[in-house]
Amino acid sequence: MAIPRYTRLTEEDYDRKLREMGNYLWELEQEADLASQKGDEPAVKERELKIQRIGEKAYGFAQIPGRHQMLGFYVAGLANRMVCRWEIAADRFFEVVEIAPTNGEAWLELTWCLAEMGKWEESEMAARKSTEFVPNSGAPWSNLAIALHQLGRIIEAESAIKRALELEPNDPRNQAILEQMRSKTEED
C-alpha cells in the first residue's frame, strides 16, 4: 500500500504555524530577558539564535505567495526586532504595511525600529500612522512623543505624551518619557 505524500501546506497551515512561531518568539524573548538579568550570557545567546532561526523560517514562509505572507513578514520583523537587527526588522515591517497599510501594530513596530536607527523623521511618520490605526493605545502616542522630541518639536511632543497618559495613566513608561522630556528641556 502506497503512503500518500503530503506536499502542499494550506493557508490555514501557514497561518497556524506562523502564529505558533510568533507565540514562541515571545516566550524566547522573556527567557532571554530573564537570562540577561541573571547574567547568563550563554543562555541569552542561545535564545537569540533560536529567535533568529524562527525569523528566517518566517521570512521563508513569506516568500511563498498567499494570504499568509503578511503574517510571515510580521513574525520575521518581530524576530529581528527582538535581536536588535533594526534595519532588517524595519524592512520586514515595511513589507507588512505594503500589503496591509492599515496594520497599526506593524506601524508601531516600525516606529521602534526607525527610532533605534536614529531615523527620527521616518519614525515620526510611522508613529503618526500607528496613532491613526491604533488611536486608543498609549504606545503609538508615546513613540510619537519620543520622535517629535528628538526632532525638537517640544510642544507637539508634550501633547503626544499627554495623550498617551490619558489613554494609559498607569503605564510607568509614559510617565518616565514625560519626566525625561521635561528634564532634557530644562537642560537646554
For each feature predicted by the language model, list its residue ranges.
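Hydrophobic/aromatic packing residues within the alpha-helices of TPR/SEL1-like helical repeat arrays
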Residues: 55-58, 86, 93, 127, ...
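Helix-start (N-cap) detector for alpha-helical repeat units in TPR-like alpha-solenoids
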Residues: 70, 104-105, 120, 138-139, ...
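Conserved structural position within tetratricopeptide repeats
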Residues: 63, 95-98, 128-132, 165-166
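Short coil turns that delineate tetratricopeptide repeat
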Residues: 66-67, 101, 135, 169
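Register position in tetratricopeptide repeats
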Residues: 82, 116, 150, 183-184
